[in-house]
């Protein structure tokens, strides 16, 4: 604490302008906890190890040449106190089961992989106990709410073998149908990071640069980010999500707000010393610190594309596609230093012809 005060005093000597913190009321003694059913740290290590060994065994039985698997679990216990009068106790849980399956064709020397289609979640170990309603059926089974690791790895091993035999895509122009397991990374990199106000202002340029969503575009109130059907929201309150907490690391209560509304850029992500720059009276609660001994700074909340008015299946989405590719899972990616031009790979690719999936592509 004494060192922090000394650093602050030293920085003040070369400060160009005063730091303006958005007002923040004190909440007194409050607490927040990730709503979980099973604490992953109370599950015996043997039970987790046995599950992973079973995952590996199922993969090998279904054609995998190599497989590795893991379950990452985090329990962050955080206490925040401020001179605003907030004393906030938070108990945050996160979990992420994952695997990577490789299939080698020793005759041709080709090899293909498929990773898990799980998601890191703000949940307890109940995430590992999938129910029928948690499964989204289709050409590949996907999951919501909970995850079946054994079922997914069995399918993954078979898909890796299919990928070796799949034909190469022919160069040309295609309509793309993007599965949520793929689209999340596109949203994260081309919407989430570009709407971080510190990147917009040039304060942050680490790991793929600043932002093309400059203040003049926001001030115009008519910058078209996408079609009228595109609505993207920031939300740190979504139950079960990876980014959900009760309060950020400046003691700001978390909330939900619009970033893109009817295809138009309407807002950014802010913390307390940025809010006044865009005329906001309060922070949007986007401040994170890695630990008590690190300076907190801006980091995106959950950023999500909102569903349309009509519920659609994959078949509904592809039925009018004459020539397209349906992409499942995330792969390699690259993006320019303003996050404007980008490419995102996938894991599984299916060719669409005349509204039907006709086969797998490489």
Predicted regions and their residues:
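N-terminal small-residue-enriched
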Residues: 1-362
């Amino acid at each position: 604490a004494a060192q922090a005060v000394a650093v602050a005093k030293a920085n003040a000597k070369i400060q160009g302008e005063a730091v303006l913190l958005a007002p923040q009321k004190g909440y007194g003694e409050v607490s927040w906890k990730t709503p979980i059913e099973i604490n992953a740290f109370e599950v015996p290590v043997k039970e987790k190890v046995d599950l992973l060994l079973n995952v590996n065994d199922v993969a090998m039985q279904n054609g995998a040449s190599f497989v590795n698997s893991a379950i990452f679990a985090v329990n962050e216990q955080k206490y925040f106190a401020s001179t605003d009068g907030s004393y906030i106790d938070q108990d945050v849980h996160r979990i992420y089961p994952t695997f990577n399956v490789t299939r080698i064709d020793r005759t041709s020397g080709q090899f293909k992989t498929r990773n898990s289609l799980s998601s890191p979640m703000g949940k307890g170990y109940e995430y590992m106990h999938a129910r029928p309603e948690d499964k989204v059926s289709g050409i590949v089974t996907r999951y919501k709410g909970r995850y079946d690791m054994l079922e997914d790895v069995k399918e993954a091993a078979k898909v890796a073998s299919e990928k070796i035999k799949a034909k190469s895509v022919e160069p040309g122009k295609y309509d793309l149908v993007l599965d949520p397991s793929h689209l999340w990374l596109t949203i994260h990199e081309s919407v989430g990071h570009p709407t971080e106000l510190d990147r917009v202002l040039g304060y942050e340029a680490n790991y793929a640069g600043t932002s093309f969503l400059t203040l003049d575009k926001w001030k115009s109130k008519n910058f078209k980010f996408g079609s009228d059907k595109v609505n993207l929201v920031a939300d740190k309150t979504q139950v079960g999500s990876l980014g959900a907490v009760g309060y950020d690391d400046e003691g700001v209560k978390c909330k939900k707000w619009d970033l893109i509304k009817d295809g138009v850029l309407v807002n950014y992500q802010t913390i307390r010393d940025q809010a006044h720059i865009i005329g906001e009276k309060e922070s949007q609660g986007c401040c994170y610190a890695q630990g008590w001994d690190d300076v907190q700074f801006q980091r995106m909340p959950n950023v999500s594309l909102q569903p349309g008015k009509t519920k659609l299946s994959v078949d509904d989405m592809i039925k009018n596609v004459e020539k397209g590719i349906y992409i499942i899972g995330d792969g390699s990616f690259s993006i320019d230093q303003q996050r404007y031009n980008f490419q995102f790979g996938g894991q599984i690719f299916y060719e669409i012809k005349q509204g039907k999936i006709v086969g797998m592509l490489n």
